[in-house]
């Protein structure tokens, strides 16, 4: 009986200790940029099954096309999921699942992984010039890791101050362009001339 109990405990330990790969890189996904704070990915859910993976970072993002996928839990439960263009999200690390693309035209999104385990918490406290984003931006999400803004192109204060590090994602004809703006930057615009939609992720 002791031997059986030991075997059961060993199997439980192995199950708990099981490791999974990170979600990216994988087919359909391109790394757009990386620095000490973030990794930015352009993600497409191709019509195929992807291996089980674990999100090792807190992450956030925005979908820029509609699309379908099937999310499969560690226990094997299958959840058909439809995502809509311009929906945003903020999610914690530790999520473990697999995914299958289910659309003829794949779901696409820009994902930011936050490399620091906790918010950095540092802001630029200067009061001049006017701080980003001014009065014309719409706040979409606010969490302990990030604030997501949708900007009206061309309507930011000029010049303006970025009190936090930020990732600017501009879309022109569903083609994303990603720019990192460091904390303390003072400039006149986000270099998004001609963009159809502009979103900024202020990293905390």
What kind of feature is each model-predicted range?
Residues 17-204:
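Jelly-roll (double-stranded beta-helix
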Residues 9-17:
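Hydrophobic h-region of N-terminal signal peptides that target proteins for export
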Residues 1-9:
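Sec-dependent signal peptide recognition
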